Each structure stands twice: as C-alpha cells, then as structure tokens.
Design a protein with these regions (language model features):
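Phosphate- and other anionic-substrate recognition elements at nucleic-acid/protein interfaces
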Residues: 2-3, 9-154
C-alpha cells in the first residue's frame, strides 16, 4: 500500500511516499518546485496536474496533508495550494485522506499535544524508528508524520 504525506510552501510542494509491506515500510522524499514565471492560476493548475500524475503513478491509497496552523499571518497562496491539493485528492483513486494541523496529526499518531508533538516534528525526539530523523528537514518530517497519520484512517 502506498501513502503520501504532503506539506506545501509558497514555492514548492514537499511530499513523502511511504510504501507499507507486511510489517515494514520504506519511503522516498521528493519536492515539486512551483515555476516562478507562472501566474497564480497557472501555478495552481501545474500543481494539480503534476500531483495528480504522482498519485496515479504511485497508486496512492491514503493521503495526509499538513495544513497551515490558523493565524492572521497565514500565507494566502499556501492556503490556495492546500485547497487545490484536497480537490485533486478527491479526483484521484485515493480511498481516504485527512488534513491536519500539528495537534490533529499528533492525535492520529497517539502523540500528546503537551509539547511532545513539537519535539518530534522538530527532530528532537525519534519517530517510527526512522533513521537520521533529526537530519531530515522539518518539512519532510511533517510529510512523514502526516503520511503515517493517514495510515491510521479507516
């Protein structure tokens, strides 16, 4: 089974594809650069089409999206990207997905929201016995965590 965890930024989409086999897993981390020369509608179309191709190529069954924490400083374009990604998931063959902020991701993973989830996301505590967890970028740590949170969906 293939699961994807996604985290967007205004300039790129980070994603981790996790393959679950029996009692083990493997993963790849990738990023999709958003062309700066495109205007906003073209950027959204590019992300939707390219990510849908990735979903189809890897036969993604479950997906998780790390969404922007609610705040007055939220980046409007990142929120648009998160919306277009949710729409493309609805158009894909994925059976189930979820969107999560830090607390809801922690809840799905059984990690308390008492500062522990932040410690794990920041790489200060291990996660799922993933080697070199601290060496991964925070964006990829979030992608992997949201992918494993999606794994727990029914």
């Amino acid at each position: 089974m293939n699961i994807i965890g996604i985290r967007s930024s205004p300039t790129k989409i980070f994603f981790s594809i996790v393959t679950i086999e029996e009692e083990s897993f493997s993963f790849i981390n990738q990023e999709l650069l958003i062309p700066v020369s495109f205007d906003t509608p073209q950027k959204l179309k590019y992300v939707r089409k390219t990510m849908l191709d990735i979903f189809n190529e890897y036969n993604i069954i479950k997906a998780g999206i790390r969404v922007t924490e609610p705040s007055a400083d939220a980046n409007d374009f990142r929120i648009m990207l998160e919306g277009i990604i949710q729409e493309l998931i609805a158009s894909s063959k994925a059976e189930i997905y979820f969107t999560g902020v830090k607390a809801s991701i922690g809840s799905k993973l059984g990690i308390p929201n008492d500062g522990t989830i932040s410690e794990v996301m920041d790489g200060n505590q291990p996660f799922n016995e993933i080697p070199d967890w601290k060496e991964l970028s925070k964006e990829y740590r979030e992608c992997l965590m949201v992918a494993f949170a999606a794994l727990n969906l029914n």
